[in-house]
């Protein structure tokens, strides 16, 4: 399912109008770099938040908080999940860069 459709489902949007569609697109565009930073995903990396998993769950939750203008509560409510995802991505990045350093040596 496309990310925009997942977000609409999470937000319980069952109607279709141009203003709502644009707002959802704006929320997704805003959420992508924010969630990459929070989760330790390189800003330059392309990441598909539509793939089921913890990152997808957190992305959709962040969109819900943004929809309701309550993003100030997101970090506190999802701190453990964010930390777990961040640790996984930081280890993956370390292994990736360590491998590059070994090849250069």
Model-inferred region functions:
Residues 1-53, 88-105:
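Conserved short "hinge" loops at termini or chain/domain junctions
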Residues 40, 47-71:
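Mid-chain, well-packed structural core segment of small domains
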Residues 69-87:
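C-terminal structural segments of small proteins and small subunits
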Residues 24, 60-61, 78:
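Alpha-helical structural signal
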């Amino acid at each position: 399912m496309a990310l925009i459709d997942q977000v609409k489902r999470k937000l319980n949007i069952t109607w279709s109008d141009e203003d709502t569609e644009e707002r959802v697109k704006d929320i997704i565009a805003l959420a992508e770099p924010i969630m990459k930073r929070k989760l330790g995903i390189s800003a330059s990396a392309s990441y598909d938040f539509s793939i089921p998993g913890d990152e997808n769950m957190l992305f959709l939750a962040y969109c819900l908080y943004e929809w309701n203008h309550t993003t100030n509560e997101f970090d506190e409510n999802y701190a453990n999940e964010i930390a777990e995802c961040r640790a996984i991505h930081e280890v993956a990045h370390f292994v990736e860069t360590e491998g590059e350093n070994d090849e250069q040596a």
